[in-house]
């Protein structure tokens, strides 16, 4: 039998991603300080931004600030929108060969390049701190430590800050993107959950039933209010990855927050939930890549 979640209180407790991310960053700064005190190189992160998309610029600025906070040296590559795939490939080759660079971040989406997979696969897997390279996703599928996709790994960290067990729970993931939904399923399988994944071909009645059965609900689609809060199981943990700007300027998630907060035990706010954890986890991956640099077979181990 699968353990059921406890009954909800009158309102959910917020999983404050900003606070938890700050705690993680403080610990990472201590790790960088210890590296430097031991005479090791400062971790280096190459941040590549193509074009001037406002949302991408905000994300990159947040990542650069986090790098500065923990003592990672950020190498900025702000490129014009007309940058070609061939030019990006040449830059990636250069960064792969640079010993000062331990992590490479290519901010997505890339204007004029509808399929970035070729470029992602060109990154040295040992420097793929986003965790998107097929080799790193493969390590995760084999239950091995490695550079894991940042958002799912950050969500696992969030779950560890609740008073609820993860093992033995029913988990439903809505959304099956390569960067969030699919690796999230792998993370929760490794954690001992029974995992259901829902997507655009899932019939509406099956989607509703899967959400109502979820002790842990992760929604990552990018459609405001896709999941009515009334569907949330009493006592569930709700992780809302979606961030959507409404016509009135408000930022909302994919889950109806007000109703969900009256049923869930824990829920992430939007904004301030998953986003800060993604950035902090990117820094975590960068430091781990620096620690593993030059050590054959480092950074991979059975979980």
Curated annotation (Swiss-Prot):
Chain residues that bind NADP(+): 175-177, 243
Pfam family, one: THF_DHG_CYH
Presence of the UniProt keyword Cytoplasm in the record: no
Gene Ontology MF: a single term: methylenetetrahydrofolate dehydrogenase (NADP+) activity
GO annotation terms (biological process): L-histidine biosynthetic process; methionine biosynthetic process; purine nucleotide biosynthetic process; tetrahydrofolate interconversion
Annotated function: Catalyzes the oxidation of 5,10-methylenetetrahydrofolate to 5,10-methenyltetrahydrofolate and then the hydrolysis of 5,10-methenyltetrahydrofolate to 10-formyltetrahydrofolate.
Protein name per UniProt: Bifunctional protein FolD
Organism (species): Xanthomonas oryzae pv. oryzae (strain KACC10331 / KXO85)
Lineage of origin: Bacteria, Pseudomonadati, Pseudomonadota, Gammaproteobacteria, Lysobacterales
